[in-house]
C-alpha cells in the first residue's frame, strides 16, 4: 500500500509536566474503558490492550490501578467521546479523538488550536474516509514474506505488510488485534514489538517541508496541550 506509519511516542515525554499529561490521558481512557465494560482485562479486550499500551509507554502501575478502582466505585465523572475531522497546515488531513465531560468546551479548545495555526474546519466524514482503522504492529526484521506466510498459516486476516530499513510493519483489520499479536508471538517467540496499537492509518500522505515543518509541529503541540484530546491522527509526512 506504500503507506508510512508515524509512531507517536508518548514515552518520549521528557519533562515532569509532559509525563503528567501522558499519565492523565491514559488514566482517563482506562477509567472510561473499565466503567463502560468489564473491570477484568481478560474479558474486556479493549481494556487489556489499553493497559498493555500504557505499560509500554511507562505509565506507573498505581496510575492504572487508580483508574480501575475509580471505575469499580461506579460513581465519578461521565465522559463522552468526541471526534473532529479537520484540515491542518498545508491541507494535511487530521482526526482528533477526545474524551470530554463538556462538549462545548472541548470543541472550542480544539477549534482554537486549529484557527490559531491557520488550519481549516471540516465536518463529520470530511477526512475520515481517507483513513483505515487498522491494527498496527512494528518490529525488527527483514523477511516480510516469512511473516506473511506465518500469519496465513495461523489463519489471520492481514491488510498489508511492509519492510523498510530493517523494520517490518503489519497492518490488519482493527478487530484482529489480539489474533495478529498472538499469531506473531506464537510463530516468532523472540519478537519485540516497537509498536502494537489500533490506529487510523492514512491512505495517502501530504508532504510538509521548509517553514511549514515548525508550524506543523507547533500545531500538534497546541492540540496535545488540550486536556480532552486523547489521540491525534494525520497524514502529514515531514520531508527529510
Curated annotation (Swiss-Prot):
A single GO BP annotation from the record? regulation of DNA-templated transcription
* GO molecular function terms listed in the Swiss-Prot or TrEMBL record: DNA binding
Q: Keywords assigned by UniProt?
A: Cytoplasm, DNA-binding, Transcription, Transcription regulation
| GO cellular component, as recorded | cytosol
Asked if the keyword Transit peptide belongs to this entry, the reply reads no
The subcellular localization recorded is: Cytoplasm
Keyword Ion transport part of the UniProt annotation = no
Q: What is its main location?
A: cytoplasm
What InterPro entries does this protein's entry cite? Integrase-like_N (IPR017856), TACO1_YebC-like_2nd/3rd_dom (IPR048300), TACO1_YebC_N (IPR049083), Transcrip_reg_TACO1-like (IPR002876), Transcrip_reg_TACO1-like_dom3 (IPR026564), YebC-like (IPR029072)
According to its UniProt record, what is one Pfam family this protein matches?
Transcrip_reg
Tell me which NCBIfam families the record gives: PRK12378.1 (NF009044)
Q: Which family does it belong to?
A: Belongs to the TACO1 family.
PANTHER family per the UniProt record, alphabetical: TRANSLATIONAL ACTIVATOR OF CYTOCHROME C OXIDASE 1 (PTHR12532:SF0)
Q: What is this protein called?
A: Probable transcriptional regulatory protein PBPRB1582
Q: Which organism is it from?
A: Photobacterium profundum (strain SS9)
Q: Organism classification, top ranks?
A: Bacteria, Pseudomonadati, Pseudomonadota, Gammaproteobacteria, Vibrionales
Amino acid at each position: 500500500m506504500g503507506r508510512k506509519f508515524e509512531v507517536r511516542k508518548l514515552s518520549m515525554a521528557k519533562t515532569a509536566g509532559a509525563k503528567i499529561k501522558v499519565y492523565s490521558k491514559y488514566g482517563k481512557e482506562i477509567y472510561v474503558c473499565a466503567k463502560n465494560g468489564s473491570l477484568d482485562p481478560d474479558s474486556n479486550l479493549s481494556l487489556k490492550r489499553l493497559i498493555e499500551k500504557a505499560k509500554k509507554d511507562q505509565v506507573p502501575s498505581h496510575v492504572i490501578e487508580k483508574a480501575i478502582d475509580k471505575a469499580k466505585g461506579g460513581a465519578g465523572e461521565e465522559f463522552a467521546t468526541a471526534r473532529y475531522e479537520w484540515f491542518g497546515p498545508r491541507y494535511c488531513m487530521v482526526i482528533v479523538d477526545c474524551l470530554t465531560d463538556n462538549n462545548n468546551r472541548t470543541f472550542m479548545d480544539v477549534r482554537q488550536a486549529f484557527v490559531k495555526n491557520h488550519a481549516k474546519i471540516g465536518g463529520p466524514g470530511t477526512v475520515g474516509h481517507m483513513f483505515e482503522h487498522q491494527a498496527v504492529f512494528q518490529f525488527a526484521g527483514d523477511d516480510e514474506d516469512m511473516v506473511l506466510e506465518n500469519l496465513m498459516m495461523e489463519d489471520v486476516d492481514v491488510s498489508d505488510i511492509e519492510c523498510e530499513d530493517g523494520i517490518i510493519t503489519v497492518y490488519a483489520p482493527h478487530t484482529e488485534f489480539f489474533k495478529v499479536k498472538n499469531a506473531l508471538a506464537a510463530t516468532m517467540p523472540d519478537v519485540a514489538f516497537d509498536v502494537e496499537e489500533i490506529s487510523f492509518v492514512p491512505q495517502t500522505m501530504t508532504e510538509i517541508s521548509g517553514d511549514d515543518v515548525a508550524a506543523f509541529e507547533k500545531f500538534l503541540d497546541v492540540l496535545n496541550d488540550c486536556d480532552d484530546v486523547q489521540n491525534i491522527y494525520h497524514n502529514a509526512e515531514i520531508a527529510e
